């Protein structure tokens, strides 16, 4: 004889659905506001991140017929796969501005990725409330914990492609899924977690299909490497393996940033660990484990940003959808806690844009335009908008100097010879002590603001 009341069970289910819909309806305006904020900033000539100008410069070099992958003696480095540059170059022919083109592509990719999460959650059996909560969680994390939404960077394009590949895989289109996953890798090379997890999961589900999927990925990946060498005359793997310092301090900082938004969702997704798991539970847990392990490994490197844990955010969003669908959200507190988490960080997030920075950027662009010629720009976007010629990849060359892979004497001599009309750096130490000493001897600081430090040759007024 049962002891529970069907009316009590019905009431509990109804309360859970109300709690979930409240969470969705409260989270949606926050996401819409932040997404609109990022989208409206797309045309602004304000640097969002040093990556923007760097990506735009390579797209412009491609359009101009220059080398997309300069040989090692060059002071400009390209350590990204090629596909995103072709995409941005195509859009630049419409916009006239490569940075704006990259931002538009990023924003569209963001929306496409959210659409893919909705479709994947539906494929995994989630109803509309759970689907929406999963997508809104991911949307909020990307907006609050990073500055990548509508930023000229290929990360979100790569994720959108790989999520489309996962959707194809769940629909049984194994070879098309493998090809799409590899396309994502040729957009951004750090997107390893999802292909790895999908391959292992499919092997466990259907050995023949899993072997077909892995073989198709390997074959298309190797074909891409051969095509790259034929097109560019060099090895893509060698281009990607640029020297970079690593440290435990970098890893600790990345873990702290991850914990700020992921600790509570990770706790909630432990609901997928149960004696009897569905095949989708296993897929999401594999994906999450791979994303966290690879993200942690990559996070030790200099210059690694919040994007290294985007795969973890996607896996958590799908996991939350499954947990919410299964448990109906056991009580309102978890939903309200997530809302509080995002609400408290709205004013303390990675999006640095406002009237003050816009004014500074306009003045800095005018300053660079007034001193035409080759320039050293850490914020390459400022140089591009000013019509200046960026001559040095500050981050990658700086890392090469710090690791001993390159000798800074050549650049130090060029600086002492006043080869550059202007220098713009984030710090005097960006290019190491030898170059810093050369700057101190040959250049004077003109001004400093939120965009960095600006130097002119000492013999110029």
Where are the model-predicted features located?
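Hydrophobic/aromatic-rich transmembrane helices and adjacent perimembrane loops
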Residues: 193, 301-328
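Transmembrane-helix motifs of polytopic, lipid-linked glycan transferases
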Residues: 25, 100, 104-125, 133
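Extracytoplasmic
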Residues: 341-461
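Membrane-interface alpha helices of multi-pass inner-membrane proteins
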Residues: 162-164, 168, 174-189, 194-202, ...
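Extracytosolic helix-loop segments that constitute the early lumenal/periplasmic catalytic or substrate-binding loops
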Residues: 53-79, 83-86, 90, 169
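Perimembrane helix-loop-helix junctions
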Residues: 15, 194-219, 241, 245-247, ...
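Specific aromatic-rich, kink-prone transmembrane helix
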Residues: 140-144, 157-176, 180-181, 315-319
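Transmembrane-helix signature of polytopic, membrane-embedded enzymes
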Residues: 117-143, 159-160, 174-176, 280-282, ...
């Amino acid at each position: 004889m049962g002891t529970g009341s069907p009316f009590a069970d019905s009431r509990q289910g109804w309360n859970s659905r109300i709690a979930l819909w409240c969470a969705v309806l409260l989270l949606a305006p926050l996401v819409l506001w932040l997404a609109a904020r990022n989208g409206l900033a797309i045309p602004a000539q304000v640097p969002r991140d040093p990556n923007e100008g760097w990506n735009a410069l390579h797209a412009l070099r491609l359009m101009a017929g220059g080398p997309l992958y300069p040989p090692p003696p060059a002071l400009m480095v390209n350590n990204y796969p090629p596909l995103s540059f072709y995409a941005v170059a195509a859009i630049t022919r419409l916009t006239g501005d490569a940075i704006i083109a990259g931002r538009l592509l990023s924003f569209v990719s963001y929306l496409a990725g959210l659409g893919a999460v909705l479709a994947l959650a539906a494929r995994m059996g989630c109803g509309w409330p759970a689907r929406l909560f999963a997508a809104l969680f991911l949307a909020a994390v990307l907006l609050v914990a990073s500055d990548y939404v509508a930023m000229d960077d290929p990360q979100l394009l790569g994720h959108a492609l790989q999520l489309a590949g996962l959707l194809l895989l769940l629909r049984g289109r194994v070879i098309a899924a493998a090809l799409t996953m590899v396309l994502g890798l040729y957009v951004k090379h750090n997107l390893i977690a999802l292909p790895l997890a999908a391959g292992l999961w499919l092997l466990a589900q259907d050995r023949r299909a899993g072997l077909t999927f892995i073989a198709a990925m390997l074959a298309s990946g190797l074909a891409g490497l051969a095509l790259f060498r034929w097109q560019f005359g060099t090895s893509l793997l060698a281009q990607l393996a640029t020297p970079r310092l690593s440290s435990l301090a970098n890893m600790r900082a990345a873990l702290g940033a991850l914990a700020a938004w992921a600790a509570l969702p990770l706790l909630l997704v432990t609901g997928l660990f149960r004696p009897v798991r569905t095949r989708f539970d296993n897929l999401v847990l594999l994906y999450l484990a791979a994303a966290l392990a690879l993200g942690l490994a990559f996070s030790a490197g200099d210059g690694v940003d919040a994007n290294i844990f985007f795969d973890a955010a996607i896996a958590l969003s799908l996991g939350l959808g499954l947990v919410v669908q299964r448990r109906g959200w056991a009580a309102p507190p978890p939903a309200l806690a997530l809302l509080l988490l995002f609400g408290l960080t709205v004013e303390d997030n990675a999006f640095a844009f406002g009237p003050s920075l816009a004014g500074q950027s306009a003045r800095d662009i005018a300053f660079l335009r007034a001193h035409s010629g080759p320039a050293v720009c850490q914020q390459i976007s400022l140089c591009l908008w000013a019509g200046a010629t960026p001559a040095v990849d500050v981050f990658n060359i700086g890392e090469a100097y710090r690791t001993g892979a390159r000798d800074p004497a050549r650049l130090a001599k060029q600086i002492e010879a006043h080869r550059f009309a202007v220098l713009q750096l984030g710090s005097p130490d960006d290019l190491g002590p030898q170059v810093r000493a050369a700057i101190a001897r040959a250049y004077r600081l003109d001004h400093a603001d939120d965009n960095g430090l600006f130097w002119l040759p000492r013999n110029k007024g």
